[in-house]
């Protein structure tokens, strides 16, 4: 599965969210586009010889991954400053505390980006960033749950092993059957569909086949 396709599914969860405060348009855009940086890396497969599979977002080599992150955030900043700041904060938290030099430099650069963007945001927008970052991460986690779990599996995906919480409320994903998922409690405006394309990749990086996961969220 391509990371950008996963992010678009995150955007579907966000778009159908029905609990106040309503996410503004720039937040919805940020959530749907938060992995636009992966379009370059996902265009060609890098094979992890040690693991015997393609690299995932968890073990992809740092230097090209961080370069892609930077390019993606640069693109977002030309389109929507608030969305770029939100995605920058998201990526910066992913490398926070890392001992790697490349990760440290990336984190410092993104903190500087955030400071720069905040100079053109309103006080209200700045005040909403932390909460909307938590909302982005919730929707990211819900999409990863769908991408990484077979129907019926209950494990929470990295980097959210402790579950899905927003504003003190925990949301539990429950499989009704192998094509239907619901959250308890239900935060959505109504049922909606999710369509997620995927490819099977051979060791030489060539696609062996493709398919599509079709789910109903109720």
Predicted regions and their residues:
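Divalent metal-dependent catalytic cores for phosphoryl transfer on phosphate-bearing substrates
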Residues: 1, 8-12, 20, 24-149
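Short linear motifs at secondary-structure transitions and domain/linker junctions
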Residues: 3-9, 156-161
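Active-site nucleophile-adjacent alpha helix/oxyanion-hole segment immediately C-terminal to the catalytic cysteine
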Residues: 17
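Non-catalytic terminal regions of proteins
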Residues: 107-218
